[in-house]
């Protein structure tokens, strides 16, 4: 027996059962004073919130005659509410002590409570719902049947009642019996008959006969009130079947007691003989309460226990304070009609928990007489022969089963055997695979942790350099170098180990491929059989599940490490910011602050406020170079297992990149330098314009650089952009056809069939290729073409950059003024453009001479600079000259 069981056996176990309300209580609608909180806690007379008559005002002592609620909490070993069944009570009370009873310990179960609280129903029950006594007998004989091959068990039962302080035998018609105390047997009832039933049916019949002889009379409280205390006792004697000179015999006694309920004559209306019965019942229960109080009071040593004050307490002497394991079932009523009885029952039950007893198994060692030796020897010889026969039968049965198994293996389907063999191989492979994978993920986590710690150490050292003195910086530098060297050494060791684990994983993958190819030989058309395919799929799913759980654990560890660093950083910031603000205002008040310091303080304020800053794509970020810490997405990402494809047996080692992590780059626009910053050289122009996307064949692209001022005249090669719907209305139909035919380099020869301007375009392109042969070929014949200067698309001189159609900033008024200023400074570069050798158009900017009404015509002329046919006449639907406008 374990130590826990011994501790429980030394203390009385107390349970409480709350019965449902009867018809009378429901009719009168008495309030409930007992509330079951859970399986162990019970609340008696709890406080209830009452709605006050006055709105928003609580009245105190409104009814001075009203009784205050006790609001008591009781804790017991088990609490059963109104919905509990007889089987539940038996499972938690008597059934656990049956094992102790079979081991030779005395056990007692008794029901205690007021009249009408449900004690008799709990112990005896009815035909539809049998009680604890009936269920105990069934389970006891069931246990005896299980051990009958090892031990000889004999049972004896007795049934008595204590009526008006007299003991009567319920199984026979006898007079009052006397109580004696024996030094060896303990308390003994002289003249009590013992019956030896052979089965559970016989013992239940005896129990039924005894209940019929029990004294019961109706009262005003209970129609079937028990007027006596009933004690049902079972004696069990166990002896080993093995013949021996020294026999060990176990003798135990179990007592199942149904006590009569305490009552008050004013409530029960008892008169005459009923009044005498009630007086004796209360006397015996009072003596029982005094015994419980004396046993529960462990502070006083050598205290007198008043067992002799009643016949009932004398019978329960062994059960309460002797060598016995006792369980008390306290039955209570939830109604306020039995308020005092319920309170007294709970009070005595709570005290009974403190009663302790010393348990001892009743094992007797019987030495046989010398005259019995011959008989014992014969019994042992017979037992030896019986055991030999059993052993022989067992060996024959085992040999027969082995032959049957061999026959099954011989006659079984070869495919089934192969399937079982492959299943075992898959189990072994995936067990190794799971271990290797777990080791790999662990190494990956340790490497990430080392990288994170290294970055934290470097960051901490930078902060120390900015804050501390030189002596402390030197010490911190030595400490940092030592830690970084240690982390580096550890990381190198982990990397080597990681490579070894990766090789092991590759070997396991090769073996898995070989097994899959062998499994394909079993199936039809080179497919794996369905059973093996399901088995393989289950193994993969199980491996993925284990891997995800491991990754979650590793992510939690890394997150904890990062959270610790964040807390330290937050503590530093919380300490520095108030000091910085205080120093700033001190300098401000004394006038020692300058503009640079104010600007720095404003920048810090912006950082603290977390304001968002809009920046162009080509502008450099000051904090971009300070990203020493690894990203959270990269930190929390572990290498995933890719689906394994089956390969032939002769294939070499599988892809070693299975375990490698594929970096996920953040999508961003390709930054192109601003064309205004390009130097006027052929090489630089070609290097910046090689293999750009074709703007004719694709949609409009957003601007990829920040427009900037141009202070010097530079030779520009504006990119060909797809004209929008607004510019298409200004361009003529011939120029649109020419632009559409430039979409593919292979179709440039077809341009000769169209307008004359297209031949000029092709010639200019060929001239450009001959002039710069080092230009790289086109990336794609359909998706992109080289962006060439706009001068090759016209026979006139090229326009300056300010005269071109702006791509983004042209829609703002400020940009228009900017380009007008640039046009005056770029006219000087027009003459230098004529020396390039290409046919160009030149339109002079006369915006300063002409009136503002002609700006509309001038803009239309600017957008038609991409015309390729110089002989075509410009046609306008409306003449916008000065005379027509007026």
Swiss-Prot record:
Give the function comment from the record. Microtubule-depolymerizing kinesin which plays a role in chromosome congression by reducing the amplitude of preanaphase oscillations and slowing poleward movement during anaphase, thus suppressing chromosome movements. May stabilize the CENPE-BUB1B complex at the kinetochores during early mitosis and maintains CENPE levels at kinetochores during chromosome congression.
> GO CC terms for this protein?
caveola; centrosome; cytoplasm; kinetochore; kinetochore microtubule; mitotic spindle midzone; nucleus; ruffle
Instruction: Cite the entry's keywords alphabetically.
Output: ATP-binding, Cell projection, Coiled coil, Cytoplasm, Cytoskeleton, Glycoprotein, Isopeptide bond, Microtubule, Motor protein, Nucleotide-binding, Nucleus, Phosphoprotein, Protein transport, Transport, Ubl conjugation
What's noted about post-translational modification? Glycosylated. Ubiquitinated.
Entry coiled-coil feature ranges: 370-404
Residues bearing PTM Phosphoserine: 674, 695, 826
Cell compartments where the protein resides: Cell projection, Ruffle; Cytoplasm; Nucleus; Cytoplasm, Cytoskeleton, Microtubule organizing center, Centrosome
Where is the Glycyl lysine isopeptide (Lys-Gly) (interchain with G-Cter in SUMO2) crosslink found in the sequence?
Answer: 24, 683, 782, 862
Q: Which residues bind ATP?
A: 113-120
This protein is called: Kinesin-like protein KIF18A
């Amino acid at each position: 027996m374990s130590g826990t069981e011994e501790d429980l056996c030394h203390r009385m176990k107390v349970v409480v059962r709350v019965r449902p309300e009867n018809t009378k209580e429901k009719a009168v609608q008495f309030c409930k004073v007992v509330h079951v909180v859970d399986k162990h806690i019970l609340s008696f007379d709890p406080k209830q919130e009452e709605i006050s008559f006055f709105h928003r005002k609580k009245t105190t002592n409104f009814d001075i005659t009203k009784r205050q609620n006790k609001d008591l909490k009781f804790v017991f070993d088990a609490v059963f509410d109104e919905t509990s069944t007889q089987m539940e009570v038996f499972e938690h009370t008597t059934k656990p002590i049956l094992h102790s009873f079979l081991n030779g310990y005395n056990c007692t179960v008794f029901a205690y409570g007021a009249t009408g609280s449900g004690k008799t129903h709990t112990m005896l029950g009815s035909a539809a719902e049998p009680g604890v006594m009936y269920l105990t007998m069934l389970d006891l004989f069931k246990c005896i049947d299980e051990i009958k091959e090892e031990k000889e068990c004999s049972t004896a039962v007795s049934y008595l009642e204590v009526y008006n302080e007299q003991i009567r035998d319920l199984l026979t018609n006898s007079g009052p019996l006397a109580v004696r105390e024996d030094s060896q047997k303990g308390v003994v009832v002289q003249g009590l008959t013992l019956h030896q039933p052979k089965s559970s049916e016989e013992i239940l019949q005896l129990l039924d006969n005894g209940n019929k002889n029990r004294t019961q009379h109706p009262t005003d409280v209970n129609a079937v009130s028990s007027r006596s205390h009933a004690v049902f006792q079972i004696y069990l004697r166990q002896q080993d079947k093995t013949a021996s000179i020294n026999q060990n015999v176990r003798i135990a006694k179990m007592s199942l007691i149904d006590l009569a309920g305490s009552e008050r004559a004013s409530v029960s209306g008892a008169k005459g003989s009923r009044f005498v019965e009630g007086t004796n019942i209360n006397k015996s229960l009072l003596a029982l309460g005094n015994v419980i109080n004396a046993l529960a009071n462990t502070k006083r040593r050598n205290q007198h226990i008043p067992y002799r004050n009643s016949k009932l307490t004398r019978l329960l002497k062994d059960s309460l304070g002797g060598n016995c394991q006792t369980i008390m079932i306290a039955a209570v009523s939830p109604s306020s009609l039995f308020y005092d009885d319920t309170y007294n029952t709970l009070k005595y039950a709570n005290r009974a928990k403190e009663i302790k007893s010393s348990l001892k198994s009743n094992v007797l060692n019987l030495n046989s007489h010398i005259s019995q030796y011959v008989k014992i020897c014969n019994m042992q010889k017979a037992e030896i022969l019986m055991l030999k026969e059993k052993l022989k039968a067992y060996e024959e049965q085992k040999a027969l089963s082995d032959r049957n198994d061999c026959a099954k293996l011989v006659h079984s389907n070869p495919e089934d055997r192969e399937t079982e063999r492959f299943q075992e191989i898959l189990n072994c492979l995936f067990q190794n695979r799971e271990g290797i994978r777990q080791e790999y993920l662990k190494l990956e986590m340790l490497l990430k942790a080392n990288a994170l710690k290294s970055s934290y150490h470097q960051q901490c050292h930078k902060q120390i350099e900015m804050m501390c003195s030189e002596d402390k910086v030197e010490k911190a530098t030595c400490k940092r170098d030592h830690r970084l060297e240690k982390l580096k050494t550890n990381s190198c060791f982990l990397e080597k180990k990681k490579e070894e684990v990766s090789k092991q994983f590759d070997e396991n993958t090769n073996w898995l491929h070989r097994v899959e190819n062998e499994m394909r030989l079993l199936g039809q058309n080179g497919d794996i059989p369905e059973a093996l395919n399901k088995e393989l799929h289950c193994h993969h799913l199980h491996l993925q599940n284990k891997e995800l759980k491991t990754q979650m654990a590793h992510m939690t560890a890394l997150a904890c490490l990062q959270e610790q660093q964040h807390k330290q950083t937050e503590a530093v910031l919380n300490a520095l910011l108030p000091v910085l603000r205080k120093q700033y205002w001190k300098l401000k008040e004394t006038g020692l602050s300058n503009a640079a310091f104010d600007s720095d303080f404003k920048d810090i304020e912006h950082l603290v406020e977390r304001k968002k800053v809009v920046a162009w794509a080509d502008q450099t970020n000051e904090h971009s170079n300070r990203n020493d810490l690894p990203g959270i997405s990269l930190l929390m990402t572990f290498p995933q297992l890719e689906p394994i494809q089956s390969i032939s047996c002769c294939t070499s080692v599988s892809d070693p990149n299975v375990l490698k992590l594929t970096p996920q780059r953040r999508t961003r626009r390709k930054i192109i330098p601003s064309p205004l910053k390009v130097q006027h050289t052929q090489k630089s122009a070609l290097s910046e314009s090689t293999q750009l996307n074709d703007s004719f064949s694709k949609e409009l692209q957003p601007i990829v650089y920040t427009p900037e001022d141009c202070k010097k005249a530079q030779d520009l090669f504006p990119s060909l952009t797809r004209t929008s719907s607004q510019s298409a209305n200004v361009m003529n139909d011939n120029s649109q056809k020419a632009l559409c035919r430039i979409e593919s380099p292979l179709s440039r020869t077809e341009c000769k069939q169209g307008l004359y301007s297209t031949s000029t375009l092709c010639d200019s392109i060929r001239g450009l290729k001959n002039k710069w042969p080092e230009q790289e070929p086109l990336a794609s014949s359909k998706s992109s073409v080289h962006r060439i200067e706009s001068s090759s698309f016209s026979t006139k001189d090229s326009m300056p950059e300010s005269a071109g159609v702006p791509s983004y900033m042209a829609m703002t008024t400020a940009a228009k003024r900017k380009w007008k200023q640039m046009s005056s400074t770029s006219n000087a570069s027009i003459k230098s453009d004529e020396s390039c050798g290409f046919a160009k158009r030149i339109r002079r900017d006369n915006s300063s001479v002409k009136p503002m009404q002609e700006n509309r015509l001038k803009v239309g002329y600017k957008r038609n600079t991409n015309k390729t046919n110089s002989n075509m006449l410009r046609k306008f639907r409306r003449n916008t000259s000065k005379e027509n406008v007026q």
